[in-house]
Amino acid sequence: MKKYILILFLFPLLVFSQKTISKEEKEVKKFQKELNEEYLNSKETPLRGDNFTNFKEHPFFPFDLKYRVTANFVKTENSEPFEIPTSSGKTKQYKEYGKASFQLDGKPYTLTLYQSLDLLKQEKYKDYLFLPFRDATNEKETYGGGKYMDLKIPKGNTIILDFNQSYQPYCAYNAYDYNCPIVPEENKLPVEIRAGVMYNDIYHH
């Protein structure tokens, strides 16, 4: 009888705890699931050989709402195309689309958002924005070359930057088959962004 009463008592607590997962955290879990599935798919993964065979899932920082910020967005008018150097020594053409300014722990930061001229040729990427950045976790818990975020053109003057959905470039896992844009100097943050994908440097040995 006592065991039955205990179950009745705990059940609503379990139900309540399941309901407390926020919409934002669900979005991050979806991102993590899709990223793992991509790397497990032999047709999509950048991994090769034993790295692919041994891959199970990415390590992630714990979800932290602190790293989901609403930034003020200012579009860059009449920006000219320019070349961003890549990890292979080649270059890729981009143009600056705008600036995103936000606060983290009470301090202001600004990051530049870009558009890939190659991707602009494809209809499905017309509203795609590219945000490469570096932070103080690089070469420790994250890839030394920095991380990326995929965003969409905002409709107003604000944009959500969810660093929980930041990921490492393909070059972090396969430096031979990919050439990845190097993070511009203006997008190097002097603070730790403990969010998104972590990195185990087992891929370049």
Where are the regions a protein language model picked out?
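Bacterial Sec-dependent N-terminal signal peptides
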Residues: 1-23
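Start-of-domain marker
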Residues: 19-80
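A mature extracytoplasmic/lumenal domain signature
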Residues: 73, 113-117, 135-137, 163-167, ...
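Short, surface-exposed linear segments at secondary-structure transitions and domain or protein termini
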Residues: 118-126, 151-159, 201
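Mid-length scaffold segments of soluble, non-membrane domains
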Residues: 80-144
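Terminal leader/tail segments of proteins
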Residues: 67, 79-86, 98, 186, ...
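Extended, aromatic/histidine-rich regions of cofactor-dependent oxidoreductases associated
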Residues: 21-25, 167-205
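Acidic, glycine-rich flexible loop segments
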Residues: 132-168
